[in-house]
């Protein structure tokens, strides 16, 4: 069986400071009939998805994505967990658009489907609103729905960043945002036990320095501002009505409120008239 091929790509970030690290996975000898553009989650990076890329590439679906600002190979030393300088969320969004352009240039005429997971799904949802014609469909994986805690969390993060500084790491913010994630896991051996039912995946995550860093106050502010935006009815109404959208989530995933939040997003999009919608 041919080996999975990974092309590493670099391009300037929209922030004018960083160089974005990106990866593009294909299988030699297998024609590419579609591309899955990945928007990865919080505290991880694209190359964690190599097993998933292998599965798709064998079936003629390339997987390509960039490490977000503050993550993976895009973050400079000592900067992991921070993309919260002014307009940080906009830079992250624009980097996704640059990556999309690179994909279209590499595979002209091939449909591109945007796949956003967890935090990455918040930005994928915003992207689908902003540049709908650049994608053939969207998959929102492990996303979160509208909730009063989104606005409350943003307010606390914004205040903390203003008072303590944008790069301040607040244990209170970590607890408010993720402190309850293991509540339904009896005898959880790791604070990250919620990420997977497979203990080996949790062990690998815990051992990976590119995953085990905290977010700064300003990064929480930017992430939660994005979540608040894509939790609005206005966002849902702005989604292209004929855009195929698939929502998926683990039934034990706390980010999506154990499925309840995901169903709220599905209902919002349905109420807004999105026609090709699956959950």
For each feature predicted by the language model, list its residue ranges.
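Conserved alpha/beta-hydrolase
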Residues: 48-79
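Alpha/beta-hydrolase fold nucleophile elbow
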Residues: 107-118
């Amino acid at each position: 069986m041919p080996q999975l091929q990974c092309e590493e790509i670099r391009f300037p970030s929209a922030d004018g400071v960083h160089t974005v690290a990106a990866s593009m996975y294909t299988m030699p000898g297998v024609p590419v009939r579609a591309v899955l553009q990945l928007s990865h989650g919080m505290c991880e990076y694209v190359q964690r998805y190599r097993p998933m890329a292998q599965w798709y590439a064998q079936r003629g679906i390339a997987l390509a994505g960039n490490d977000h600002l503050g993550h993976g190979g895009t973050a400079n030393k000592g900067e992991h967990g921070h993309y919260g300088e002014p307009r940080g969320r906009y830079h992250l969004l624009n980097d996704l658009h640059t990556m999309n352009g690179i994909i279209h240039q590499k595979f002209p005429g091939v449909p591109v489907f945007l796949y956003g997971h967890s935090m990455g799904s918040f930005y994928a949802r915003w992207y689908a609103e902003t540049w709908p014609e650049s994608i053939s469909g969207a998959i929102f994986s492990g996303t979160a729905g509208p909730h009063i805690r989104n606005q409350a969390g943003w307010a606390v993060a914004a205040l903390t960043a203003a008072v303590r500084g944008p790069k301040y790491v607040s244990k209170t913010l970590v607890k408010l945002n993720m402190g309850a994630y293991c509540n339904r896991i009896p005898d959880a051996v790791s604070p990250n036990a919620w990420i997977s039912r497979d203990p080996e995946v949790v062990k690998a995550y815990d051992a990976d320095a590119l995953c085990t860093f905290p977010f700064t106050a300003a990064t929480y502010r930017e992430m939660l501002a994005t979540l608040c935006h894509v939790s609005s009815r206005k966002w849902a109404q702005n989604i292209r009505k004929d855009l195929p959208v698939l929502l998926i989530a683990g039934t034990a995933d706390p980010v999506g409120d154990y499925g309840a939040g995901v169903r709220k997003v599905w209902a919002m999009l349905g109420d807004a008239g999105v026609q090709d919608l699956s959950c």
